[in-house]
Amino acid sequence: MVTYKDAGVDIYKEDKVIRALASQIKFERTDAIKPADLKGHYAGAIEFGDYYLVLCTDGVGSKMVVAEMANKFDTVPIDMIAMNVNDAICIGAEPVALVDYMAVEDITEDIASQIGKGLNDGIKESNINLIGGETASLPNMIKGVDLAGTVLAVVKKDEIVSGKEVKSGDLIVGLRSSGIHSNGLSLARKVFFDIANLDVNSKLSHGKTVAEELLTPTKIYVKPVLEMIKQVNVKGLAHITGGGFRKLKRLNKEVCYKIDELPEILPIFKEMQKLGNVADEEMFKTFNMGIGFCVIVEKEDAEKIIEISNHHNIPAFVIGKIEDSVEVNGETKKETVLVEYNNKKMIME
């Protein structure tokens, strides 16, 4: 069975690398501009009067490789923006501005125009301003194009959503993804191009081409989630990206997240799993599996969350609940994420 590690990505090694880097960061300012206590969360923030200024930075990873194969660059900028703004809203912050960074080996005016169109589409959907950026020509360092960005967001101090209030009995509402989003592309490319010997124009069994599926842009959840925060007591927010539902542990680490009511898995994931003979556990640790964002609320508020999401044309479902502990093979587990799928219980460690 093929794994993400076989495709060149070791998420556990990445965790260790991040910890090694973070262990060396010891300096903090000693004046009134202090960082918020959000270590390990989706976004970083500093105090600024009655507000927190929030920063997120991210790129599109190897999705750009598929864009180059298909010679289609107008959607990947939307992915870059989505990866940033969707992280920012996880603490209740409203994204307001973006700066982008593009590193190129060589680039044509046509590709630049496509990227510009995608940037405009992404900032429009996110309701943010693009206020600057950098384009670096690095022919001796890079092949093709890499695109990343940093988003600035703001939130009032008394309105931050940290996830610390998540408790047993709360429900987890899952918002539909548009597909693969921007994570797991290395494994997807290995399955489709190396194992199945397909190309970007090959049609999959459900009718779409490989390029159409892999280049569908990441869903931007800014508008519905900000509306939810205004209308409902939202207790936790999670952007489901690399690592899948493991991301829920970024919120309250003292509870269990039990995912046991998943909707139908999207065709792209079924196709990939079949072609690559990928295990269920590997799929759920690598991909969003059709749920791109989670909202945690008290039981009586779940229907309102679903109503708001549907109003924004994003299907939403109660996919699970918060518990103090879960039972797996006769063993009691605490402080974990449990996914039940195909009559199988999988711990997402």
Curated annotation (Swiss-Prot):
Where, per UniProt, does this protein localize?
Cytoplasm
Q: What is its EC number?
A: 6.3.3.1
**GO annotation terms (biological process):** 'de novo' IMP biosynthetic process; adenine biosynthetic process
State if Ligase is listed as a keyword: yes
Please indicate if the UniProt record lists Ribosomal protein as a keyword: no
**Record's GO cellular component terms:** cytosol
Cysteines paired by S-S bonds: none
Write down the chemical reaction(s) this protein catalyses.
Answer: 2-formamido-N(1)-(5-O-phospho-beta-D-ribosyl)acetamidine + ATP = 5-amino-1-(5-phospho-beta-D-ribosyl)imidazole + ADP + phosphate + H(+)
- Per the record, the domain of life is Archaea
Gene3D superfamilies this protein is in? PurM-like C-terminal domain (3.90.650.10), PurM-like, N-terminal domain (3.30.1330.10)
Q: Which SUPFAM superfamilies match?
A: PurM C-terminal domain-like (SSF56042), PurM N-terminal domain-like (SSF55326)
**InterPro entries attached here?**
PurM-like_C_dom, PurM-like_C_sf, PurM-like_N, PurM-like_N_sf, PurM_cligase
**Pfam families reported for this sequence:** AIRS, AIRS_C
Q: Which CDD domains match?
A: PurM
Q: Which family does it belong to?
A: Belongs to the AIR synthase family.
What GO annotations for molecular function exist for this entry? ATP binding; phosphoribosylamine-glycine ligase activity; phosphoribosylformylglycinamidine cyclo-ligase activity
> Its annotated pathway?
Purine metabolism; IMP biosynthesis via de novo pathway; 5-amino-1-(5-phospho-D-ribosyl)imidazole from N(2)-formyl-N(1)-(5-phospho-D-ribosyl)glycinamide: step 2/2
Alphabetically ordered keywords of this record:
ATP-binding, Cytoplasm, Ligase, Nucleotide-binding, Purine biosynthesis
* Name assigned to this protein: Phosphoribosylformylglycinamidine cyclo-ligase
